[in-house]
From Swiss-Prot:
Originating species: Bos taurus
Pathway(s) the chain acts in: Lipid metabolism; fatty acid beta-oxidation
UniProt-annotated binding residues for (R)-carnitine: Y439, T441, T452
Gene name, Swiss-Prot/TrEMBL: CROT
Motif Microbody targeting signal location, chain numbering: 610-612
Compartments where found: Peroxisome
Name this polypeptide is given: Peroxisomal carnitine O-octanoyltransferase
Main subcellular location of this protein, as a coarse class: other
Subunit details: Monomer.
Keyword Iron included in the entry's annotation: no
Any one GO BP annotation for this protein: medium-chain fatty acid metabolic process
Amino acid sequence: MENQLAKSTEERTFQYQDSLPSLPVPSLEESLKKYLESVKPFANEEEYKNTEAIVWKFQNGIGEKLQQKLLQRAKGRRNWLEEWWLNVAYLDVRIPSQLNVNFGGPASHIEHYWPPKEGTQLERGSISLWHNLNYWQLLRKEKLAVEKVGNTPLDMNQFRMLFSTCKIPGITRDSIINYFRTESEGHSPSHLAVLCRGRVFVFDVMHEGYLMTAPEIQRQLTYIQKKCHSEPDGPGVAALTTEERTRWAKAREYLISLNPENLTILEKIQSSLLVFCLDDDSPHVTPEDYSQVSAKILNGDPTVRWGDKSYNLIAFSNGVFGSNCDHAPFDAMVLVKVCYYVDENILENEGRWKGSEKVRDIPVPEELVFTVDEKVLNDINQAKAQYFKQVSDLQLVVYAFTSFGKKLTKEKQLHPDTFIQLALQLAYYRLHGRPGCCYETAMTRLFYHGRTETVRPCTVEAVNWCQSMQNPSTSLLERKHMMLEAFAKHNKMMKDCSTGKGFDRHLLGLSLIAKEEGLPVPELFTDPLFSRSGGGGNFVLSTSLVGYLRVQGVMVPMVHNGYGFFYHIRDDRFVVSCSAWKSCPETDAEKLVQQVFHAFCDMMQLMEMPHL
């Protein structure tokens, strides 16, 4: 073990980036075969035959030409998907991204040394910030261990995007600006932005070449809070980041035209390490029920979140914490890693600051005061109005299932992630009486700048098993057999998707090549079964495993009649979050989660069946 630790400090965080394999282009025939299999649960015989004919025509016609063009594209770049994915999945999207695209999550400090307690916001906030800043320094020094699967390194590029990164709204397409540099690359910004009661402050976290201590950070936060609590609220320019993207882009251009100083202020916020949000709310939270705090993280006060920042760290009045992140620059596992690092350090230090109490003579924080006029104030009010309207429609529950967890599923030789996915399939089937097309995230970080691929858990095998569970004449043994077949299928799909053999991103690539070539949209993509099975961003169940650490995530559904279902796995429990829109009469997040918990028990009961 000692050797391993010594070795890990010698490895630099980004040292393998140049030697990672390029993202492969899968075989056309294989992808189409997998696609056909995935639409089966949503088609009758006639519809399936029709789609089969469309696929065959595509494979032997335009599909082959598009595949050749895609292979050409892949020759010239190490990741043929990267730029496309960023644009299509994030930067071209015009709907407000803060609520619809961002992800968030509550900190689990409440489970040990930091239960909710009024009057602790600033002291705890400064300790949490200090650990976050240590993580930033590890990244700058490239001392963060390279993540690996076995001995194979994973792409670490997304970790460059955690700090000093921001999305900039554009009229038709947004852009991402990243100011972070490692120490060997040169200067990197070292200031924090703090939002409080509609006002914006910044201060440098380095003083005379050293990182501020937690008591020094606390002094800065106290100065800001006292000032904000004894003076009128600011205009809340941050609320503009909740707006529809083109609207926000125009409002931003107008803001800059009012006074060039406004651009300087925007750039200071954009380049800040992270945005620390002092929130006056005191949401309820327990280790078994994170619903209220999670909702506030996703849909809280828009004047104290900068929706375009890659990292908003939120401190509530009762000393409870959470994060809200723009999804464009990175996927949730980056946030999971920093949150876990901070939580472990808080745990190790019993929630206290154990360093020096000395506070150096440090310049007070600088307030950034925007020049605003009637039009800007109107824009802010309009942004808030549309934000609160959508926010009031969100239903979100986050509960812990504590009867068992990973330990028991492993004992039964069941993959815990697959266990939850199949429970969700059964729960949806029981609640809605039909199969639910489902998106589960697989990671493709084995490849250069790899991000994600789609696993489609609603397989023929899963549906057959769900039907057997609802059919009183099917024996328990048959049900168990069918369940294990569904497990095997899911595990194989996950393996394929993680190793570059998925088909969703491949089909996206083929459709984008057609678009770039000015060709008509191939029939494959206009076939009703394409969208009914989830294609084109139509998955009714949008899901992801957040990991095996004490970190939970939340996101809104992908479609109006769908659910956002995110979960993490521990030895003794499964923690799940489920979101839905109240204005959709057929969805109910609370009921779905109860059905999932019910399914967990039913599945475990099947495993108690002796092998005959």
